[in-house]
């Protein structure tokens, strides 16, 4: 499989459309909320168009996840690496969200900015711990619009299961990218895959995951494995743990 970081975005976005309820636990953890897990969140439109001042062309902007739960709006960006543009992109996405949901009152507009978080699938010593946006106004007032970033490498497999952080699970295996790509020792990776298969199956048996959710998560794990291994000798051995190679997930 060609190395294309859009593969990560595609899986994250597919999860939000096919299994949006799985994001409730993620939002509860990221934003210190306690929404019931049986409520139905609303996926808000994320595509807007902005004129690029450098090219004078109209470009589409689409955030990874914009979701409304009980009247609260959340923006989540899934980033494979730091490219120096995340803060300005968040500012654009957040303003577009606020504009699309603006409240108009006789010459006055109220812009409700969403709470946001950036999730780094892969990270290094250079990955910022915070995304910081400062809004400065002509009257001298300044508003900070910041968040603490989530680094996936800091979340253990046990916490992903106990906190029901299902959207993170397909990307867990990226922490072994160096070993997989360079044909190093993958015993720990194999052990972790077995752990996820066992624990996800238990959650299915306890009716916490539907058959489609279980199989889709496992197949998304395999897509990430295939992305990393790119057909090397480890690929077949690793994907077999989750049930072999599947090109389409059950929800598709």
Label each PLM-derived region with a short phrase.
Residues 3, 7, 44, 88, ...:
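Alpha-helical structural elements
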Residues 68-80, 103, 183-252:
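Short, charged alpha-helical interaction segments and adjacent helix-coil junctions
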Residues 1-167, 252:
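Accessory alpha/beta interaction modules
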Residues 34-37, 44-50, 98, 172, ...:
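Charge-rich, low-complexity amphipathic helices
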Residues 161-188:
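Coupling/switch segment of ABC-type P-loop NTPase heads
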């Amino acid at each position: 499989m060609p190395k294309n970081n859009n593969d990560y975005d595609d899986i994250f976005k597919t999860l939000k459309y096919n299994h949006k309820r799985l994001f409730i636990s993620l939002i509860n953890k990221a934003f210190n909320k306690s929404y019931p897990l049986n409520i139905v969140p609303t996926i808000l439109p994320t595509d807007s168009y902005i004129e690029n001042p450098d090219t004078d062309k109209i470009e589409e902007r689409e955030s990874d996840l914009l979701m409304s739960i009980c009247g609260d709006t959340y923006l989540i960006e899934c980033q494979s690496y730091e490219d120096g543009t995340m803060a300005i992109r968040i500012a654009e996405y957040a303003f577009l969200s606020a504009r699309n949901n603006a409240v108009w009152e006789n010459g006055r507009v109220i812009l409700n900015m969403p709470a946001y978080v950036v999730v780094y699938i892969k990270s290094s010593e250079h990955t910022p711990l915070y995304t910081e946006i400062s809004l400065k106004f002509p009257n001298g007032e300044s508003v900070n619009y910041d968040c603490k970033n989530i680094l996936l490498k800091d979340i253990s497999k046990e916490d992903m299961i106990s906190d029901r952080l299902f959207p993170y699970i397909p990307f867990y295996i990226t922490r072994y990218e160096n070993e997989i790509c360079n044909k190093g020792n993958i015993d720990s990776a194999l052990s972790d895959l077995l752990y996820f298969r066992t624990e996800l199956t238990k959650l299915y048996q306890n009716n916490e995951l539907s058959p489609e959710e279980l199989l889709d998560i496992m197949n998304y794990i395999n897509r990430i494995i295939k992305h990393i291994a790119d057909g090397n000798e480890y690929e077949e051995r690793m994907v077999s743990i989750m049930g072999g190679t599947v090109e389409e997930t059950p929800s598709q």
